[in-house]
Amino acid sequence: MGDPPPSQAGAAGAGVDLRATEVSLQKIAVWASVSLIAGTAGMLPLDAFDGTGTSTRQIDLPTWMEDPAGDGYGYGDWAYQVLASEMLRGNAVGIIAARGPRGLPTQIVMQHPDEIGVRRDPTTGEVEWRVAGTQIPTSDIWHQRAYPMPGRIQGLSPIGHHAATIGLGLNVLRFGNQFFEDGGHPTAILKTTASLNETAARVAKTRFLAAVSGRREPVVLGGDWEYQAIQIAPEESQFLETHKLTSIECCRIFGPGLAEVLGYETGGALTYQNIQERNIQLLIYALDPWLVRLERALSAMLPRGQYVRINRGALLRTDILTRYRAYQLAIRNRIQAPSEARELEDLPPLTPEQQAEFDSLPSPAPTSDSGGSRA
């Protein structure tokens, strides 16, 4: 028995079929959330380590991890596919195309989530995977799930679980297009004090439209006629309010804080400090759970004792003055070596001549934020 497919939108989102993964991305808030998390994760650098505790040492990242799919598009492209699949369908499935000497995967080609089929044989209990209708040996399947549920092979699909909310949001957009482009309401009223039957009213309307069609000249009306334009604010149809609410809810499907970071829910002036706080909020509440899943998946493909860490510091990169003060504090308290600070700034090691220049300079006086004390 397999897992249930993603459902169609409920009553609120009637007419919207979300069974195709790309349909949900038509909702801008869904697209923005997926793009922000998957895109950001793919841009953050990877570091590999060996050992634990005081014996931990950084090692070279395996060359295959620079392009896990082996298609030339690189790690960032591959990571985007993994996280986008997990965020939209709750699962990321790839085919293991190559293995290393220890039998660990060294090439994984991601598959479109809508082409994946899986079932558990009720007699043998074995799991059967199919990709685009072709059965694939379970040993060749690489599967990661974001929302695991007891008794299910695949994780919950966020899009299927929240189909009504996303469907409502798409219907609101469709209504908005019709409202503003097709004229979802009459644009004006042509009134007269005379009594008109249906035929006379139709003739008057036709003649008026013929008089104003394609012209910018003023229209002359008799004393018995009055033209009144209808101006309906979009708020009166609850278009913007509903659009805003569904956008906020769509963002929250993928993590708290995304609605605020993407600007769907705001409050107060946006300052540099607020931007820094938002980056931290994004990392802690929305992005980090996805980064941890990706780290664990990558670490599982390394020999025992080795693991991968995604460098989150690149996301929280501050202004140059703040960074230099942080380096000074870390170096004075022997948390970080000067060479490490230079490496973080993409600077080469000091040459002997540069080192001599530094040695000839007087020692700087301790500062209030140095964390140390005077000798």
Q: Where are the regions a protein language model picked out?
A:
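C-terminal hydrophobic structural anchor segments
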Residues: I284-A330
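Glycine-rich and small/hydrophobic secondary-structure elements
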Residues: Q281
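Short acidic alpha-helical/loop segments enriched in Asp/Glu that coordinate divalent cations
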Residues: V220, L258-L270, A297-R304
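Structured, contiguous alpha/beta core segments that scaffold functional sites
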Residues: M1-F239, H243-L245, E249-R252, Y264-G267, ...
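Generic, well-ordered alpha-helical scaffold segments in large soluble proteins
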Residues: R207-A211, E249, I253, G257, ...
